[in-house]
């Protein structure tokens, strides 16, 4: 018992010589090696308790929000109780943002980077309806292939004949028009004239 652990001796020596130990406390006030008791460092223990409490409250809030989100978007159910297969998906960004198919967005929902209503009137909206295959006695998995059905072109006459092509999502018609404009005398855009 005469031989004490050198690390414990160093900790006790440091603790005794520190300013916190000038009150006459001894090494028995340590909970473990290097961890002060509540009476020595009550401020640190209060801070640790507050941080732990905030962490637990945050964890509970996130878990409740996550479970609420999962119950709303139950797999196989749409917004109004319909199955996912009955709700068509559109590749048009404006439709995804507003839920409406109108050409002119409301003034409070306009994106200032798009150029306002003048550009919105010039754009050609081209979107596609993606329909999933109906389940045959089972819930479709994440690897179920998507059947591409129809492509609908909703266009208005443009004031400018040659302008930049609008940004379209899921658009086949715009690529076809570009290919015809680039190679009017060739059957395909990527075909090259034969070398003679």
Curated annotation (Swiss-Prot):
Report the InterPro entries cross-referenced here.
Answer: Sit1
Which tissue types show expression of this protein?
Specifically expressed in T- and B-cells. Present in plasma cells but not in germinal center B-cells (at protein level). Expressed in T- and B-cell lymphoma.
- Region forming the signal peptide: 1-24
| Example of a GO MF term | kinase binding
Quick one: where is this thing mainly located? membrane
Residues that bear Phosphoserine: 80, 83, 102, 182
What highest taxon heads this organism's lineage? Eukaryota
* Annotated stretches, region: Interaction with GRB2: 90-93, 188-191
Name the glycosylated positions: 26
Q: Name one GO biological process term.
A: T cell homeostasis
Assembly mode? Homodimer; disulfide-linked. When phosphorylated, interacts with PTPN11/SHP2, GRB2 and CSK.
The entry's function note states: Negatively regulates TCR (T-cell antigen receptor)-mediated signaling in T-cells. Involved in positive selection of T-cells.
Protein name (Swiss-Prot/TrEMBL): Signaling threshold-regulating transmembrane adapter 1
Q: Which organism is it from?
A: Homo sapiens (Human)
């Amino acid at each position: 018992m005469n031989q004490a652990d050198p690390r414990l001796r160093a900790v006790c020596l440091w603790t005794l010589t520190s300013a916190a130990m000038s009150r006459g406390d001894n090494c028995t006030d340590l909970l473990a090696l290097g961890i002060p008791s509540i009476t020595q460092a009550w401020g640190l223990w209060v801070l640790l308790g507050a941080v732990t409490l905030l962490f637990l409250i945050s964890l509970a809030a996130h878990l409740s929000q996550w479970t609420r989100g999962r119950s709303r978007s139950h797999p196989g159910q749409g917004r109004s109780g319909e199955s996912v297969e009955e709700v068509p998906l559109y590749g048009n960004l404006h439709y995804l943002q507003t839920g409406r198919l109108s050409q002119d967005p409301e003034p409070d929902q306009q994106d200032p980077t798009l150029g306002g209503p003048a550009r919105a009137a010039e754009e050609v909206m081209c979107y596609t309806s993606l329909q999933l295959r109906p389940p045959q006695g089972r819930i479709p998995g994440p690897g179920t292939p998507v059947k591409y059905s129809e492509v609908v072109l909703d266009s208005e006459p443009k004031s400018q004949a040659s302008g930049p092509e609008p940004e379209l999502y899921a658009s086949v018609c715009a690529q076809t028009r570009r290919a015809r404009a680039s190679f009017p005398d060739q059957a395909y855009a990527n075909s090259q004239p034969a070398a003679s």
